[in-house]
Regions:
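Hydrophobic ligand-binding cavity/cleft-lining segments
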Residues: 1-44, 129-138, 151-155
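Glycine-centered tight beta-turn/hairpin loop motif at sheet-sheet or coil-to-beta transitions
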Residues: 1, 53-55, 78-80
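Short, hydrophobic/aromatic-rich segments at coil-to-beta transitions
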Residues: 39-46, 65-73
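Small-residue-enriched segments and motifs
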Residues: 32-34, 60, 85
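Beta-strand/loop substructures that line and gate deep hydrophobic ligand-binding cavities in soluble
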Residues: 63-64, 72-132, 136, 141-145, ...
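Intrinsic-disorder/low-complexity, polar/charged segments enriched in Ser/Thr/Lys/Arg/Asp/Glu/Gln
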Residues: 3-7, 44, 57, 70, ...
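Short, cysteine-centered beta-strand-loop-beta hairpins and adjacent loop/turn segments enriched
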Residues: 52-59, 105-108
Length: 155
């Protein structure tokens, strides 16, 4: 099992940053390995990604979501992965975004790559591209302010 924790400061208000992060279908615009994300309902996503030259598809469940605080998920099938994204208000115009993620490595090369920091570099790069994406726009492309607890929409 490999784990990654990376953070970045985004020069936008917390609600703008959070709202943009909830636009999961926009992820391919800043996540290098992600080819497509389809939101099938309020708590389920279908992912397609290419990692290390290998194509992966899986379904994930949003297990927890609280506006301007956290989005957590877990894979329902395919290669195991889970994690959460935390949003912390620094001041009126800046937000700290932290990604915490765990995933199962497959084979010696993935395990070695993980151990050598390739996962951290990937997440750090994706966060940097997210920062550029939202800061250059100055506004979110949309937003979902609902709440999820234990995989169920509660609000």
């Amino acid at each position: 099992m490999a784990s990654v924790t990376e953070s970045i400061t985004v020069e936008c208000p917390i609600s703008t940053v959070y709202n943009q992060w909830t636009q999961f279908e926009e992820f391919p615009r800043f996540m290098e390995a992600v080819e497509a994300v389809s939101q099938t309902d309020d708590t389920h996503l279908h992912w397609i990604a290419e990692i290390g030259g290998k194509r992966y598809e899986w379904d994930a469940e949003i297990t927890e979501q609280r506006p301007d605080e956290v989005v957590s998920w877990r894979a329902l099938d395919g290669q195991y992965n889970s994690g959460r994204v935390l949003f912390e208000k620094i001041d009126q115009a800046r937000t700290k975004v932290t990604v915490e993620m765990e995933h199962e490595t497959e084979g010696m090369m993935e395990t070695l790559g993980s151990a050598l920091g390739s996962d951290s570099r990937q997440v750090k790069g994706d966060l940097g591209r997210f920062k550029e994406f939202i800061e250059s726009r100055g506004a979110e492309t949309g937003g979902w302010r609902g709440e999820v607890n234990a995989g169920e929409r509660v609000r």
